[in-house]
Regions:
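Hydrophobic alpha-helical segments
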Residues: 1-183
Length: 183
């Protein structure tokens, strides 16, 4: 199923999300196609809705190179780990945790095989979904140092927020007994 077909099933109470997704994926000008579709994929995976993720991967396979698709999946995977670890060290009152060695492998951050700024952008989007302020700050700083504008960064965050919200709606609709999710 394509994303458009899946989005058509979103109920009327989430019409704003449908419209936002359409405009963010079809009318935005701040991001390259790779940046946009990598953000959609990484955000879908981070949002943990199987139907949305399946549709996003299917649509993105046409938009991204195999290497780009793999890198977007890698960004979601590594940030799934890092966001928990660094959110803990950031939020814990005991400051010693932040000084202890991480001892977690993160090689994919340097070996993903695509443009570094695109990978950083996807990591920032996933970090926003997962609520890790330390990771958001770290990746946003790299993006700004590499010449990304605030507008480009927030374009990816808009996509992440809408993808996450749509995934939540799909989860809620799936939990309803014998009701179909029609618009």
């Amino acid at each position: 199923m394509s994303l458009d077909e899946l989005i058509d099933q979103i109920p009327a109470y989430a019409k704003d999300l449908k419209l936002n997704f359409s405009s963010l994926t079809k009318q935005q000008t701040e991001l390259t196609p790779q940046q946009l579709w990598g953000t959609v994929v990484a955000s879908a995976i981070a949002s943990r809705n199987a139907r949305f993720t399946e549709a996003a991967l299917s649509d993105a396979a046409v938009q991204l190179s195999p290497q780009g698709l793999e890198a977007a999946k890698s960004a979601a995977a590594i940030m799934g780990m890092n966001n928990i670890y660094y959110r803990f060290t950031h939020l814990a009152k005991n400051e010693k945790y932040a000084t202890l060695p991480t001892r977690l492998r993160m090689n994919v951050i340097r070996t993903h095989g695509i443009e570094q700024v695109d990978f950083e952008l996807w990591c920032t989007a996933v970090s926003a979904i997962n609520g890790c302020g330390a990771c958001i700050d770290s990746h946003e700083q790299v993006l700004r140092q590499k010449g990304f504008s605030e507008e480009q960064i927030v374009a990816a965050i808009r996509i992440a927020s809408v993808v996450h919200a749509l995934a939540c709606v799909l989860d809620a609709e799936a939990a309803l007994p014998t009701q179909s999710a029609t618009a």
